[in-house]
Each structure stands twice: as C-alpha cells, then as structure tokens.
Amino acid sequence: MILINGDCIEQMQKLIDDGVQVDSVVTDPPYELGFMGRSWDSTGIAFQKETWELAYKLLKPGGHLLAFSASRNYHRMAVAIEDVGFEIRDQMMWLYGSGFPKSMNVGKAFDKKLGNERKVVGMTNQQDIRSGNYVGKATDTKEYSRIDVPITEGNSEWEGWGTALKPAHEPIVMARKPLSEKSIVDNVLKHGTGAINIDECRIEGNDAKYPDTNPDFKDIGRQSKEAIGIDKLSFGQTENAKRKKVVRKPRNESGVWTDGNSGMKAEGTQYADADPKGRFPANIMHDGSDVVQDIFPDTKAGSYKGDGSKSGGIWNKSTGKPAGREYGDEGSAARYFYCPKTSKSERNNSTVKNNHPTVKPQKLMQYLCRMVTPKGGIVLDMFMGSGSTGMAAKDEGFDFIGIEKEKEYFKIAEARIESVEVKATLQEFME
C-alpha cells in the first residue's frame, strides 16, 4: 500500500516511469464547482486530458476507471476521459436524499428590490448551510445545526420561482482501457482485467433467496411437502424454486422483428429456475433514505431484517446467505445496491478528526472497488481526499495507491486507512 502526499500529475508520471501498473482506478475528483471557496475545487484538473491520460497509462489493458462527478458538468470530465482513449462503458448513479437546493427565491428577491413587504405565514426548522457541510455529499445530517426560519409570502408575479433544483444524484463514469487481446477471455488470462465481478456485487432479493415471500413463485413448499413430506422453503432450500417469466413471441422465419413479435407482445408466462445468487447489479446505487425510497413507491418490507447497513444488501458468496436485508423486493429500491450515508463515527474513525467536506461512504467505495478489481489487484485513487477509497480497498483485500495534494487531508487519510484492520485469509489463519 502506497500513500503519496503530492501533486497527482507529477506523482502519476513518477509511477509510470517506475513501471507501475494498476488494475483499476476508483476516484472522486474535484467537481470543479468552486465548492465553499476551496481552491482545490476550481483548478480544472478533472477536465484536463493530461490527468486521465496518465491514469490510462497506469492501467493495465482492460482495466476499469470509475470516477464521480457533479451532475451539471459531468460531461466535461467524461469527454476528457474518452478523448485520451478510454471506452465509456456506462454511467452509474449515486442517489441520495440529503441534497439541499441552492436556489434563489426569485419572488423574494423581487420584493426586496422593489421594497415590498412580505407577509410571515409560518416558521420552519431547517439545516443551517452556514455550518460548513456540503449537504449533497451524503454526510451525517446529525452534524448540521438547525435554525428557525420564517416562511414568507409576497405579491410578486414571480412568487414561487427559483433558480435551481434539489441535488439528488452524483453521476459516475464507468470507462475501460481498450483490450490488448482479441477477446475478453484472452485479455483476462493475460492481464486479469477487462471483466466486471458480477456475482460478488449481486443484490439480494425475494425472487431467489426468499421465494416464500414472493408472489411470483409457485407454491413449492406445499408441493414438496405433498411429494416428500418436507417443506423445502422452511429450510431456505431454493434449488427447486421457480420464478415467473414472461414468454415473448419469437422473430419471424427471416429473423426480423415486426410489430407482432417485437418482444412487447407476451404469449403467456412460464416458470424458470431462480438464480440463488441474487439480482444482477445495476447502474444505480442509493443511500437508503426515505426520500430515495419514495421514488420507488412499491417498496414492501420483507420477513427478514438483517444488518443491511453494514452489508449494502450484497449477497455473501462465502456463506451462501444474505449479508443483511432491509427491503422487500417488489419493483422497489431493494433492486439496487444501497448503503447509509457517511456517519459521524465513520468520518472520525481514527485518531484524527476528519474535516474533509466531501466524504464518500466506505461501503459504497468497497462495492465499486469490488466490482472492477480482480482478486489481489491494485486500486489507484489519485484524488484520495480523506481516504475512503483506501479504506475500502484495504478492507476488500486489494492493494492501494493513493495520492493527495493537500497535506491536511493526507494526514487524515493516513490515519483512517491505518485504522482498517486487514482480514486474515483462512490459509493465513491456519498457519
């Protein structure tokens, strides 16, 4: 594990000169919004081709890059990444409910300019944005002070107009360095990169692991009990479970789709074997907040409630059991990876107080590292900040190279990463 305090352009070039190669890049660069007047958030480095060209050179062929950005200027970073040779594979979304709309009240501004009096119609208790935390970064809401603010109403024709929407997502570019070999298989065999770790990022759900609570399943328990005297579902056995599958009309003889067989025309339903490993990972993640869950109104509580806040709703392959479940699974937010916002204890889980304003949840970064990094691989984060990616990589058993220019944040990152205990493998434990 290598932690470097220095300029990322200079330090990445040194790593290239030393022949270093990494398996993945998972990073949260400056959003170039001039956030809170911080100089490091207005340098333009996230939009520079040179930044991503160096990352490109450090990556093995087929290696993936995951980089966060802001919704309003994501395109500039994505274009810079693509222009240096990366293939844009997808755009992921991190949804959260803690965003605060930085919108001007146009009606109020009009009344102030014209000297109109506004009528106080009530009071509200809201977060004090002057407390210095960035609401759109999923930090613990308990850290915000709250103040009473009067609700006023004016007579301007522009009453109710504003200038901005409530921020509720951060896009993540998923890019891949082109393969050096003719196929994915050959590239993986040679470099260990090029593929995505689907099974280790599957999302638990009723359709496979809890067929007894899923209305789409046949009554396997009753049928098995009648046949062999044992209710298989009572033991959580799902090898005979079936899920409902819509049968689509096939193409015509020439293999051409028509209005009559477009795939939207269903002939009926059949029952297919359920996948016990869980749902296929999607390009949406969320913080599990009520605001986000309300977007998916079909959320229905399941019969089992585990410690989902620690697992992120991920299927635990090593035990064959869910790592924890807090949602049902009927067309709801449960279909997507979730982890709670960065808590105060997580921010300050070392001997150094963490005052970095844009801390990502460690579990979110673990999920991303796990998705694109092969076993024993090296993760690079050239915008290390307070070290969440480093903590995630270490916790997942990956090696890590982190670069951070700001001395203050570098010391915080060192302490936070040091606080993560390395999990011993079974072989190491036996030895």
Residue ranges of each PLM-predicted region?
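Core catalytic lobe of class I
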Residues: 1-431
